[in-house]
Amino acid sequence: RVLFRSEAEQIIPAGEVCEKCGASEWTKDTDIMDVWFDSGSTHAAVLEERPELRFPADMYMEGGDQFRGWFQSSLLTSVASKGCAPYKSVLCHGWVVDEQGKQMHKSAGNGVEPSEIIKDYGADIIRLWVASSDYTVDVRAGKNIFKQLSEAYRKIRNTARFILGNLDGFDPNTDCVADDQLQEIDRWALAALDDLMVNTSAGYAVYDFNKVYHAVYNFCVVAMSNFYLDVTKDRLYCTNGAGRKAAQTTMYKILVALDKIIAPILCFTSQEIWDFMPKTEGMNKYVVFEEMPKAGQYAADEAFKAKWAQLIAVRDEVKKVLEQARAEKVIGASLEAAVTLYCNDTVYSLLNSIPMDELADLMIVSQVELVKGEGGAASAVEGLGVAAAHATGEKCERCWKYSSSIGSHAAHPTLCARCASVVEA
């Protein structure tokens, strides 16, 4: 520090002369003495000289070749001058290579221009590519890789888009319902969200962004799009009051937490979501200023998780039978089906704990019946047999479910009683 700040005459003692030529005027040399010494001294020249920074650094990040370079020279100079390391942690990453794992060279024409990727897919795709990669080894990059990743990005974005669309007109300050008004599947979705918080928090803590990416992707695609959002579509479209508000309350809580989780990676997308999201008092204008959601607030006990794992297993078996019925031209869409579930006492008790209309929604069929005893097609769930037939009644033009109540409202002869009441409301 003294060397950088002081003039030559302040460093050299008065009267000092050159032994060779006898000169007494001194000038500081601006040449680099040693590249590793200079770069290894940056903790003193940068961290300690800038008031907005602090010593030691939270992290030094570089490629693996720097263990004998910058990492080492920084450690040596800091230990020698201060007795401690200049960093709290070190993160080492591999190199970016092409799709075949070869080094990129201009002469080979195998480089990837970030501006072209941004033009085609947006800047968040590059950030998602980094997060989805195992950076501890060499990372492959290429147009095909970014194209594939754009599909994953689209699924995450579409999950948020679907939820936002169904929050239209929802005011979280007045419309949120109490926990005891949520359906069981709503509580399952929030429990899945809590698991996401646990996994992403653990990933961020150790810079394992690949773990964060996979947790978010699986949550959006498997837990949300393929299951929860699919099951709740009918409730959102065809009911008013507590049932719809319960689904919206659940979706709102999910979207708020999910957006905060993806913000460090998909910073532009998360802010776009945040801008369209209904707010409660105290929310920041920018999502990056929000605290990460804390796990535990929606956690479910193991018995509840086991119950819903079994219900999902039953649903999967029903889907297999529906596919067979579709192949045999018995039904077209799943809502054309009436399902009979033959159960032993254990399975009957499990399924009977869910209201029949909610159970039909879970299976995405018009009608469901529980029967104690054996029957139907054998399944992978012990004590369960499944049979499918065409649903009775007529098809509602609004919800597409089959019902005997079609035309019960004179003003709406093609609607079921439920949809007629929604239209009249």
What kind of region is each of these model predictions?
Residues 50-51, 59-66, 241-249, 302-310, ...:
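Short, contiguous acidic/charged loop-to-helix segments that flank catalytic cores in large enzymes
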Residues 1-55, 62, 179-196, 271, ...:
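Cys/His-rich finger/ribbon microdomains and the adjacent scaffold used
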